[in-house]
Amino acid sequence: TLIRRAKDAKLFVVYGYARLVGYDRELELVPDILEDVEVEAGRRFTFHLREGHKWSDGHPFTAEDFRFFWEDVAQNPKLRPTGPPVQMLVDGELPQFEVLDERTVRYTWSKPNPFFLPALAGAAPLEVALPAHYLKPFHADYADPKALAAKVEAEDARDWAQLFGRHSDEYDATD
């Protein structure tokens, strides 16, 4: 049974959303939001985003959203003290991440990562992209320091990292 306790009800919401890749009826991993996924030797994953795909606010979903997550969030010790998601590690090694163009990104490991695509298709999918256009005003590397300090105070946050965390929670964000 997938849902046993009241707190497991969150899985209903999670499975109700599209993800980058998902399982088809034969339980094969196939593109969902992505237009295409190229996998080479189980170690190089190239994602091609659908043209015209947008975030819920209508802003384009682009490679910048992946770059922002990888460089400015996942590897930022203030936002992710434990570092990038464990599913991104192969024998302790992080992937090389590349933006190939506005709609194409690539992750490359020196060894195969058999857990990467299944993690993206899971009930609580691996996070690899965030809406950069929306979150940059809450990130210390992008926001005007005075404006950010005012937002931290106005929202009664401990610091900019807590404020960023509140706004990056897609299940709890109010705007």
Regions found by a protein language model. Name each.
Residues 38, 85-171:
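Surface-exposed binding/hinge segments that line
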Residues 175:
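Extended, Lys/Arg-enriched charged tracts that mediate electrostatic binding to polyanionic substrates
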Residues 20-22, 46, 129:
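Hydrophobic/proline-rich hinge and linker segments of small-molecule sensing/allosteric domains
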Residues 36-80, 106-111, 116:
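Aromatic- and charge-enriched surface segment that lines or borders ligand/interaction sites
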Residues 15, 32-34, 40-44, 61, ...:
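Extracytoplasmic
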Residues 23-30, 82-91:
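Short, solvent-exposed secondary-structure boundary motifs
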Residues 1-41, 71:
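N-terminal lobe/hinge region of extracytoplasmic solute-binding protein
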